Each structure stands twice: as C-alpha cells, then as structure tokens.
C-alpha cells in the first residue's frame, strides 16, 4: 500500500465517521436516567449484616454442639450455607453499586452533552 492510497482511505474513513455520527453513538451508549446508588448501598449493608450474623450463629452452633451429628451441628451448617449465600449476594450488590456509581458519573446529564442535536434515525 503506497502513501497516496493510505491517505485516501483515511479521508474516506473520516468522512464516513463524522463527528455528529460519533457524538450520536456516544449519546446512545450513555444512560439517560440516573441510577439509584443509595438503594444499592443499603442492599450492600443489609446483605453484609445478614452474612455477619449468619456466620456468628454458625460459629456458636459449631462450638456448642456436643457431638458432630447433633442438631446444633446441623443448625450451624445451615447458618453457614445461608452465610455463604448472602456473602455472594453482598458481593453482587457491591459490584452493582460500583457500576451504578460509574454509570451516574458518565451519564449524559453529568457530561453536559447536547444529545438532542445528535439523534440519528434507527
């Protein structure tokens, strides 16, 4: 490919990808409504608290079970499973909180982009 061909293909590419089309694509990707980070943070706190309590109950049940086949030992295993389930839920809620935070940070209302003039027909 010689130099003349490369410059013409670059010019064609820039003509095809004009600024207005690029702005419209960016505006279509950005969220238009703000995400509720406060509610997600409350879910993180609630799930973490339930996880903490469940692991404490499991620890108490395992320590005070007289034998490893008793009812308290079984109850400790149930609390342990509940604790692991809520630990996974709290991790998912934390990831959702971070995603909501950055979605709000990069929304078109925060970036002050004029997306009305960049609308494209679909």
Swiss-Prot record:
It is found in: Cell membrane. Keywords: Cell membrane, Membrane, Transmembrane, Transmembrane helix. It comes from the Bacteria. The chain crosses the membrane at residues 42-62, 71-91. One of its GO terms (cellular component) is plasma membrane. It is a multi-pass membrane protein. This is Uncharacterized protein MPN_593.
């Amino acid at each position: 490919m010689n130099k003349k061909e490369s410059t013409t293909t670059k010019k064609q590419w820039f003509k095809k990808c004009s600024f207005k089309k690029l702005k419209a694509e960016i505006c279509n990707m950005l969220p238009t409504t703000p995400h509720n980070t406060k509610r997600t943070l409350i879910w993180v706190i609630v799930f973490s608290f339930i996880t903490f309590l469940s692991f404490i109950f499991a620890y108490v049940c395992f320590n005070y079970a007289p034998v490893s086949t008793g009812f308290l030992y079984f109850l400790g295993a149930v609390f342990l499973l509940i604790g692991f389930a809520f630990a996974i839920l709290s991790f998912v809620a934390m990831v959702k909180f971070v995603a909501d935070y950055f979605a709000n940070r990069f929304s078109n209302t925060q970036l002050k982009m004029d997306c009305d003039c960049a609308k494209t027909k679909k």
